[in-house]
Regions:
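Alpha-helical recognition segments enriched in aromatics with Gly/Pro capping
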Residues: 1-55, 267
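Active-site-proximal acidic segments at structured loop/helix or strand boundaries
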Residues: 52, 56-144
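Beta-rich accessory regions
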Residues: 163-172, 180, 261, 268-275, ...
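A conserved acidic, glycine/proline-rich C-terminal tail/linker
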Residues: 238-256
């Protein structure tokens, strides 16, 4: 059985390891059992995959997205949906009380009410995703921009009032005001089209997040005519300054979560030690899918 866009041949994997392209036989970009486990694939998802494709001695190929489908189906009703900011920029609510902390009731999994709720701290200073703000937005951009009102997920409506920039013109802080009558998503007085997620700046925790992609170039195929591999230079992106909900401080190796609007992630079982938290992407949403999850 041949899985598209991955390296399966033992001698090719050995070369990737020897050349330092991957960090071992359990590198999450590979499809060994140890690699799949480290990336977050469950035994149930692998069994589902085998059941779907069938076991055959005949040579055949299966698209990698089939494996991703199986892990999504397995996890979607099992794991908590948490807020994590992968590329943070500070958001200050200028009219919010300075030292106030509110705890918002948030469903652990909107599709599985039996998983209950949790309390998420909300403060004057938050972090949001940098891509959720634009100074000069295109048409049909419904997230944050000057003068626009958006919903902070499970919290309040806020309206952007301005930005701070450094000497190079980079945005360092976004300012907004909030409407205290719009708390918790139950407000029906007016509608907004954009919803973005957030994490408290003072209560959030820091973590490293690793985003994995196909180790080979999807357009060119796995192998060249001479037998060499078309390595994707962007198969791993390491994000060092991510800010996550404080509850994730209790996460343990191989715990799995859905990061709202980003995808499914697993605590690395090799590099997460003590106070160092490392999350590996198991399944990333496309930008369209992320907007659908908002």
């Amino acid at each position: 059985l041949y899985l598209t866009n991955v390296v399966t041949g033992k001698r090719y994997i050995k070369k990737l390891v020897e050349d330092g392209v991957v960090d071992g036989w359990d590198d999450p970009r590979l499809v060994s059992i140890a690699a799949l486990r480290r990336r977050g694939f469950t035994p149930e998802s692998i069994k589902m995959f085998v059941d779907l494709v069938g076991v055959t001695k005949a040579q055949g190929s299966v698209e990698y997205p089939m494996l991703e489908y199986c892990i999504r189906e397995d996890l979607k009703l099992k794991v908590k949906r948490m807020m994590a900011i992968l590329d943070p920029v500070k958001l200050v609510i200028d009219n919010y009380p300075e030292d106030q902390v509110e705890y918002m009731d948030v469903a652990n999994n909107q599709e599985n009410p039996e998983m209950g709720t949790r309390k998420v701290p909300f403060t004057k200073e938050l972090y949001i995703e940098r891509e959720d703000f634009m100074e000069e937005p295109p048409k049909k951009y419904f997230r944050m921009f000057p003068g626009n009102e958006v919903r902070l997920m499970n919290a309040y409506y806020v309206t952007c009032t301005g930005v701070d920039k450094d000497e190079n013109g980079n945005i360092t802080c976004i300012h907004c005001t909030y409407d205290p009558e719009t708390k918790g998503g139950n407000f029906t007085g007016r509608k907004v089209k954009g919803t973005i997620h957030w994490v408290s700046a003072s209560r959030g925790i820091n973590a490293e997040v690793r985003l994995y992609d196909n180790i080979v170039d999807e357009e060119k195929g796995v192998y060249n005519e001479d037998g060499s591999m078309n390595i994707n230079p962007n198969s791993l992106t390491i994000l060092k300054n991510c800010v996550l909900e404080p509850e994730l401080a209790n996460a343990r190796p191989e715990d799995r979560f859905q990061f709202v609007r980003n995808g499914y992630f697993c605590v690395d079982n090799k590099d997460s030690k003590g106070n160092v938290l490392v999350f590996n992407s198991c399944l990333l949403y496309t930008s369209d899918a992320a907007d659908d999850k908002a």
